[in-house]
Amino acid sequence: LALLGVTVASAPLCSRLLGRNAGWVLALPLIIATVMAVSVYDGVHTESTSWIPSLGVDFNIRLDGLSFVFLLLVLVIGAGVLMYSTRYLHHKDSAFYFFITGFAAAMALLVTTDNLFVFYVAWEMTTLCSFFLIGNSGEKGHQPAIRTLLVTVLGGLLLLTATIIMSVSTGTMQLSEVIASDYWADNPGTLTVVAILVAGAAFTKSAQFPFQAWLPDSMVAIAPVSAYLHAAAMVKAGIYLILRYSPLFGEVAIWNILLIVCGLFTAAFGAMTAVTRDDLKELLAYSTMSQLGLLVATVGIGTDAALTAAIVHTIAHACFKAALFMSVSYTHLRAHE
């Protein structure tokens, strides 16, 4: 994470010195971080340091199987997108490299932190980076960026409310301890409320009904942004959230109902809308929405087999959809030559 922080800080300078070729240099730390993650992973790897002692906020890092999978997606696909950008961009763009590396760092923090407050901060950082990356696409991106921000900020408020309730109720800010707390067995009403809030937060991030409109709207962004944020990383933050809390909410009926019903509706709506589109990028946006709906519904089933299938399909979808977005962009460029 420190390496990624240095990468973000150095992105503007690298961009000024190297222009669009800065992507080669900025991709290197992500590759190194991937190697480091693989080398330290031993099933469950934890690190902790005090951050805000007066509030009981520690900087806890927990690398378990779920975190490891999502961290590799963030780092590997992020490195690929940065290298792709060196040939896609036609001019020096310091803002792009700063915010895309900032997004990578925020996502890496989100999937590895074991602290509720830090998780929320990382969640909002991805929202802000997405807003600036979409808005950086020119005048046509300003309104979609604002609409995307409004929807995802709503999800952030839902997550913040859930975070406060969980930390106050259990007396801890450590995510793994919150999930394992005995408090929930004696307070099913509070558990149900938190489950609804967390599901709502995930729906805004992963473009699920009734918050699905922002995803196709945001496709005005350039191809590297669509490939990374809206196919491989940002929309997967919501999937990570529901997978992470699945052990806690798996027996809550409203949780399963929300995920299955909204997920299947989104999957059907996205698929039916996709086949009516003749713009390739728009088609991919709706098909992404459909696939995310299937993932959400699968997590809602809640069995071990279903959760395993959801994780496997998350990996497959992130890889092939990122590649498709970059391929479609190349097709558009050649078609307009």
What is the meaning of each model-derived region?
Residues L1-L3:
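C-terminal regulatory domains involved in ligand/effector binding and gene-expression control
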Residues V8-F98, S169-D186, A213, R244:
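Transmembrane helix-loop-helix hairpins at membrane boundaries of multipass inner-membrane proteins
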Residues G80-Y97, T101-F119, L128-R334:
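Hydrophobic transmembrane alpha-helices and their helix-loop junctions in integral membrane proteins
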Residues E124:
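Short phosphate-coordinating micro-motif centered on Lys-Gly-acidic
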